[in-house]
Amino acid sequence: MGKLIIVGTPIGNLEDITIRALKTLREVDLILAEDTRRTMVLLNKYRIKKPLLSFNERNSKKRIKEILPLLKEGKKVAIVSDAGMPVISDPGYNLVEECWREGIEVDIVPGPSALTSAVAVSGFPGSKFIFEGFLPRGKNRRRLLKSLKKENRVIVFFESPERLLSTLRDILEIIGDREVFIAREMTKLHQEFFRGKVSEAISHFEKKKPLGEITVVLSGKE
């Protein structure tokens, strides 16, 4: 039997890659990547030449049927996401699940995570929090926010720049004007941190159009 290795990669700054992650990517037989073009940038920087295969939400079922036989033949396969840890709001969980069912070894090479990085820098308590991934759209988002109104733990979620303002307006209306921390483009050239009331965040991003990858940390009910 081979081995599936879940490898964490940088969330922005490519220098945040770990020594063990580089060693692993150099040793495996195949690398599964959410977007092969983005992963190639990382591999080229560190002069790693390995076969790359796309693995995303659209093709995961097909890919699993191709990859399981390779693992059973003894191949070592790494899976990476575009940024951060695979499976965390990214493709991969179904492959990991199938490996466990088939008795194939699964290993982990931990790396950066936008989730934990945002909580750490937010100044909010990090001992208890909930993660909602990417919030749903429209009525489903409002329904979810209503269910979170009485949540006393810190709430963390990812959001797209196009939807950030509408999400913040829904939060203000449904949950209230709580303290919020917004991390944009973490570890990248145009990194931005904002902390203040939800109403202040709305004013800020109405004046300055949000761009890039965004993580939102919302304080819990007091």
Swiss-Prot record:
Query: For this protein, what reaction is catalysed?
Result: cytidine(1402) in 16S rRNA + S-adenosyl-L-methionine = 2'-O-methylcytidine(1402) in 16S rRNA + S-adenosyl-L-homocysteine + H(+)
Describe its function. Catalyzes the 2'-O-methylation of the ribose of cytidine 1402 (C1402) in 16S rRNA.
Q: What is this protein called?
A: Ribosomal RNA small subunit methyltransferase I
Give the keywords, sorted.
Answer: Cytoplasm, Methyltransferase, rRNA processing, S-adenosyl-L-methionine, Transferase
- EC code: 2.1.1.198
> So which residues are the signal peptide here?
none
Cellular compartments per GO CC: cytoplasm
What is the annotated localization of this protein?
Answer: Cytoplasm
- What species was this sequence derived from? Thermotoga maritima (strain ATCC 43589 / DSM 3109 / JCM 10099 / NBRC 100826 / MSB8)
PANTHER family to which the protein is assigned, alphabetical: RIBOSOMAL RNA SMALL SUBUNIT METHYLTRANSFERASE I
The record's listing under Gene3D superfamilies reads:
Cobalt-precorrin-4 Transmethylase, Domain 1, Methyltransferase, Cobalt-precorrin-4 Transmethylase, Domain 2
Regarding protein family, the annotation reads: Belongs to the methyltransferase superfamily. RsmI family.
Which taxonomic lineage is given here?
Bacteria, Thermotogati, Thermotogota, Thermotogae, Thermotogales
Name the Pfam families on file.
TP_methylase
Molecular-function GO terms, alphabetical: rRNA (cytosine-2'-O-)-methyltransferase activity
Give coiled-coil spans as residue ranges: none
- The record's principal subcellular location, in a coarse class, is cytoplasm
Keyword presence, Transferase: yes
